Amino acid sequence: MSTALAPTIPPTHPAVVTTAPRAPLATLTVPTVPPGPGQVLIHVLWTSSTPLDLHQADGGLLITHPALMGSSYGGVVAQLGPEQPRDHLRVGDKVFGFTFRGDEEKCHQTYMTTDWYMVSKLPEGVRMEEAVAVSVNLVTAFHTLTADFGLELPWPVPAGENRERDTPIVVWGAASSVGNYAVQVLRHWGFENVVAVARAKHHEYLKELGAKVCFDYTDGDVVEKVLRYVGEGKEGKPRVPYVLDCIGSLEGTLKKIAELAERGTKVAIMLPVIVKHATEKEAPVYEMDVNKVLPGAWKEGVELKGTRTHFYLQNEFFKDHLQSEIVPALLEQGVIKPNKLKIVEGKTMLERAENARQLLRSQAVSGEKLVWRVADE
């Protein structure tokens, strides 16, 4: 049961939508959904564009056109539904978060409606455009490290030494948004042997975030360098027990990782696997089943896992606490540094969305998150 919209809120609003694979984006007028029990209606001011948006707009990944896009928002609470389970949100609060389940939760629109546990209050001293670049990939890092690797990330963080502090964990594509947050999360939870693989220009920053050592994936012998660094496996474990592939590219990451992984190595791969990148002239090619990628190239006993962040809600603790409590606390405490930003300009919401898509398609961004304004205050 939903409530009626407050009289100050418009019954319809504009949203950016896909129209066909690789076709120009368009603006569509959509209904404003009143918040039901435990829900929050948010006036969206900022959003980000992610590789998933490109995969959907150019490759039609898991959607039917026309489709609303966007999974990260920063905005202001416009209306609260009844029966709020926590007394932590007020109309007018500045908030941010990660949503993905239905059109009413898509973020490339001026109003969106979601559940209370998908909402983070903006901490003092953090700009909204910074926060909008955090939740999607910070949640991805938490989900991957716990669900795919089986690592423990208890909250609150316990005092004392992490018994796996010396275990080597390779973060391949560490300069990406997911990579940045994975490195920081691992550091904060006491994993001290994080091996970051990224272009050399990012190494100094990655060490500031928590990487113990960095290697450049453009080096022809990068696999040999990583294996030399980690040395022999301990207690029957593989030399590299965990590899997080933050990119999921057949040519760009997986061929090298297949050389690195051995029996017992858990390899978590961001989905979809990019078999062929989108270009101005060619459509992308994707694969959602990691076990169909590079058949015959993986050593026997390697555990391949396709990361599906949307499943994080199956973890009841994370569902109730990750966005509503943990993410804003880590930002407020300065534990997590937001990604470096690139503000995408344009005269209209549609133009900004299209400009962001073009930047993603041309692979023109490295080590930055694309954010853009949705609506004015």
Language-model-detected regions and their locations in the chain:
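Terminal helix/beta-alpha structural elements that buttress the NAD(P)+-binding lobe
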Residues: S2-G36, H43-Q79, R86-E377
